[in-house]
Amino acid sequence: MSGFVLDASVALRWFLDHPMPVYANRVKQFFLKGIRAVVPALWHLEMSNGLVVAERRSILTTADVDQAMMDIEQIAAQALDTDSIVDSARQSLATARAFQLSAYDAVYLDLARRERLPLATLDDRLRNAAPRAGVELLR
């Protein structure tokens, strides 16, 4: 496997869940072994939003969030951001309609389809749409 598309639903579990869900841990191990993670530009905003929500709910401390953001910058340095927001917005609308997804989730599906890479996600709707779109799920 040359790489995979990393959905924020998986990556957030690396910072929020202890113990980490089995699937999220398995995906993290792929990443730590040097398998390339591909993320859309939207991923960075989803990650920071998930962390600030966890801070507001007292799941993480401010220090935890600050450390997680530094870790995310390291992840992002190894990730390949191959799309622009404008291009994503155009395509995601059609994909969202076709597969009854949010526009945000459609961006991940489109990226996986375009790059011909498996998709790592914990989102049920996205997991259900992937095979119908011809996208392999990372197991």
Q: Language-model features: where?
A:
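Acidic, PIN/NYN-like endoribonuclease modules and their adjacent C-terminal/linker elements
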Residues: 1-3, 85, 109-139
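Short, well-structured N-terminal submotif of metal-dependent ribonuclease cores
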Residues: 1-42, 54-67, 132-133
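Short glycine/serine- and small hydrophobic-enriched flexible loop segments
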Residues: 49-56, 113
